[in-house]
Curated annotation (Swiss-Prot):
The lineage of its organism: Bacteria, Bacillati, Bacillota, Clostridia, Eubacteriales. This is tRNA (guanine-N(1)-)-methyltransferase. The keyword Cytoplasm applies. Its main location: cytoplasm. HAMAP family: TrmD. It catalyses: guanosine(37) in tRNA + S-adenosyl-L-methionine = N(1)-methylguanosine(37) in tRNA + S-adenosyl-L-homocysteine + H(+). InterPro entries: Alpha/beta_knot_MTases, tRNA_m1G_MeTrfase_C_sf, tRNA_m1G_MeTrfase_TrmD, tRNA_m1G_MTases_N, tRNA_MeTrfase_TRMD/TRM10. It is found in: Cytoplasm. It comes from the Bacteria. GO terms for cellular component: cytosol.
Amino acid sequence: MRIDVLTLFPEMFSIFNHSIIGRAIEKEILKINTVNIRDYTIDKHKKVDDYPYGGGAGMVMAAQPIVDSIKTVKKENKGKVIFLGPKGKTFNQNLAKELAKEEELIFLCGHYEGIDERAYEYIDMEISLGDFVLTGGEMACIPIVDSICRLVDGVLKSSESYEDESFYNGLLEYPQYTRPATYEGKSVPEVLLSGHHENIKKWRKAKSLIITNKVRPDLFKKYKLTEEDKKILKDFNKKL
């Protein structure tokens, strides 16, 4: 997958040179480029923003450098142009899975009070990270790109690494334990030490369902319980 990020702060994306994403870039599974929008301004002082027409607080990013940077990147990257903004669709795991199927993507990071409305003509999709305010689009872009990239084939060693994680199947993840088996008087559940893979699988599913219902009832309501799920919960409750 190739991703180009249009930003005023390309240095912020050096985080992708590390850990899982960094290794995927080294293996050429991923290619993440940053493009400095400021390089495309025709203003002699390298300004990319100006006062809003009609007055108001703050500054607005000008259309010209945004549009010119998009046009340049589009010569090599034919992917969707995604703007990180408050009017967009709220990002979630399903959207991450959908975008992970793309071969190329372009992300536009806004700043200041927003972007000139005329730049929207070159934007295919707007995504919001949530109902809160961030300093700039970069802060939203980094977790979104990370979430998408880790679902690309070959980035993780196995699909099992993400298929059991929170949100992937609409549920929160089950509790995790590691050595020692007993710590401060608290022991790991016996089923996890049993070596019985089917029982472990059922325990994890039951805990995932119970935790989701308890802390994220909104997610649980959207989840469609199967007959197997109902049986797993019934059997689990009998053992309590």
